[in-house]
Amino acid sequence: MAKLHDYYKDEVVKQLMSQFDYNSVMQVPRVEKITLNMGVGEAIADKKLLDNAAADLAAISGQKPFITKARKSVAGFKIRQGYPIGCKVTLRGERMWEFFERLISIAVPRIRDFRGLSAKSFDGRGNYSMGVREQIIFPEIDYDKVDRVRGLDITITTTAKSDDEGRALLAAFNFPFRK
């Protein structure tokens, strides 16, 4: 079992119960899922780019990504409905906790010119979204084999009811928020 999950059950739950005066352990917010999304708009011209992006996402997440397709045609972007334009992965359970641990302890500190993550990226319901400009911050990606530096979106979905609860949950995991 992931160390971060044990830490959540042993320490974070107690900390949040006292901070927000919850009556039951089930009221304490928890991390529900982590979604990784990589948009590859250039895939319209070259299908190999999407395969490489999917391979990178599979290496980062540890599971096969789902190819996302365009919902509608947009002439300005030269895409038609149904064209493959990206890939995404939804992590839950054990893989989610392992990825979350790697994200906090290894990947985020490797971001170039890192000064902390914005504490304003919550959506109003306790979910946190962040963007990563280059996938090479993850140790699973071999820098020499990367054909193109790509970014990805990471969304951490929690059961928190408000941004304050979500912020307290992530801060309890020592999430590196900007001061």
Curated annotation (Swiss-Prot):
One annotated GO molecular function: structural constituent of ribosome
Record InterPro entries: Ribosomal_uL5 (IPR002132), Ribosomal_uL5_bac-type (IPR020930), Ribosomal_uL5_C (IPR031309), Ribosomal_uL5_dom_sf (IPR022803), Ribosomal_uL5_N (IPR031310)
Keywords annotated in UniProt: Ribonucleoprotein, Ribosomal protein, RNA-binding, rRNA-binding, tRNA-binding
A Pfam family recorded for this sequence: Ribosomal_L5
GO biological process, one term: translation
GO cellular component, one term: ribosome
Subunit composition and interactions: Part of the 50S ribosomal subunit; part of the 5S rRNA/L5/L18/L25 subcomplex. Contacts the 5S rRNA and the P site tRNA. Forms a bridge to the 30S subunit in the 70S ribosome.
Family, similarity comment: Belongs to the universal ribosomal protein uL5 family.
Function comment: This is one of the proteins that bind and probably mediate the attachment of the 5S RNA into the large ribosomal subunit, where it forms part of the central protuberance. In the 70S ribosome it contacts protein S13 of the 30S subunit (bridge B1b), connecting the 2 subunits; this bridge is implicated in subunit movement. Contacts the P site tRNA; the 5S rRNA and some of its associated proteins might help stabilize positioning of ribosome-bound tRNAs.
Protein name: Large ribosomal subunit protein uL5
Organism: Serratia proteamaculans (strain 568)
